[in-house]
Structure formats: structure tokens, C-alpha cells
Amino acid sequence: MSGRNQTSTGHEASEAGWLDLHFESSRPEYEAALLDAGIRPGWRVLDAGCGSGGFLPLIASAVGSSGFIAALDLAPENIDRVEALAGTLPEPPEVATHVGSILSLPFADASFDCVWSGNVMQYLTPAEFELAVGEARRVLKPGGILAVKDFDSTILQILPMDRALLARFMAARLQGFRDRGVLGTDCGSTLPARLRQAGLEVVSRKGWLVERWAPAPRFTRDYVRDLLAYFASVAPGYALPDADQAYWRELKQRPDRLLDDPDFCYREFFVMAVCRI
């Protein structure tokens, strides 16, 4: 796994192994969100920005063997993973994979009952977000739904890490997103407003808290260990106090000191907004 968990497209925090750990750590909440999207048997669903395919089995279960799934991602290596995963699904629907961009979908108008997009919008600029929403609206059938999920990392907590220290790190990190012009990992709570501004009717919006106390499950420990290593790798590029930089260097060497603490707690928050066309 690369130091910044990049795909071949250069997107950070989106390498397949990283995505898999994060998905398994948050599985109950992710499953609840997908069920809440309202996907029905027999539907044609586009997984727009499918990553390594974590949501594919859940979508397949929702649409059943009479349904159809198109899985699209920019990274060819992610599509390779999805193709292998599709072959293991029990009583699978038809699954078609595509290397491509959500900004220019390779599908005909009114092709899908649902477009699902999880943890993708954070990588887009506001203009690209509007373009992606326009493309989703184009390929949806009348009455179809667009379900968009993303994080609000302003609520990220990793206890017993000093909250002020993490707040300084996250402020620098979020400013980096602003400087690059992308929505960033705090965009989740802004999704309903952005979708309305793009001319869509938001029919539901809901947030989920992912909370894991010590002793944390294995997937959570592995994910947070990787997350801490990632944060430590980017911290030198931020204007943080010397004491903060020293903390991140030490934590990179000894992450289990935090993970093994009896008061360890990891919290993250995400929001899903559902629109009807």
C-alpha cells in the first residue's frame, strides 16, 4: 500500500486495500445507508465511482438476479477488483464494469433506476460536482433516484488523542482541500444544499455516526492504524506547531500505544442525501 494510499489516478485515500479496510470497519452503518436508499428488486443501478466494489454485494442483494448493475471507476485496478468480486456473488444480477469518469458517463439517457455514489464527491470541485449531478440526472429514468453519500470529517474523533491537536491537524487538512478547490472530506453535510442548488429535489437526508470503542474490532484497528500512518505522512506538509509534528512522528512509530488504550474510541460521521428525478 502506498504511503498516501493512492490509486493509479493519483487520488489519495482511495487505494483498494485502504477502501476495503474502511468498508469493513464501517460495514453495519454502510449497509444501513444503502438499504435506506430504497433500491428495489429488478432495478438497473449505476455504482458511480465504485472503488474496490465494497457496495457491490449489497447492491446485488437489493436488485436480485433480475436486476442490473453498472460499476464505473477511474482506476483500472479498482475495476479489476470489482470484476473478480462480481464472479463470487451468489445468484448475481448482470454486472457490467467500466473504466471511466462520473463527469462523462458512457451510458444512454434514461438508462438507470438509481445512481449510487459513495465517498466520491469529496474529490470534485464545485463545478465538477454540478457536472456529475447533471450526468447522473441525464442517465436516470423519470422517477429514478440519485443517492449520494460522503463524509463530514469535522466530526472525526480518535480518542484519547488530544482533541486540540487533532483539530489543528484537521483544520490544516481541510484548508488544503480549499486551496485545491475540491469539496473535501467535510462535504457530507453540505450535500443536500448542493443538490438543491443543482436543481434536484432532495427527498431524504440522514447522517450516520460510526463509533467503535475499545476493544475495537480487528478491521477498525487495522483501518485506524493505516489512517494514523497516512495522517503522519502528510503532517510534515502542514504548518503545525513543533510539538504537534513531534507527536505525529512518534505516533507513526507507535500507533498501538493509542489503539491499545482502554479508552480508545474512533468516531466518524457520514451523510446520505437521496433525490428523485
Which stretches of residues belong to each language-model region?
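A short glycine-rich, Lys/Arg-flanked "PGG" loop and its adjoining helix->strand segment in the class I
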Residues: 130-145
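Class I SAM-dependent methyltransferase Rossmann-like catalytic core
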Residues: 2-27
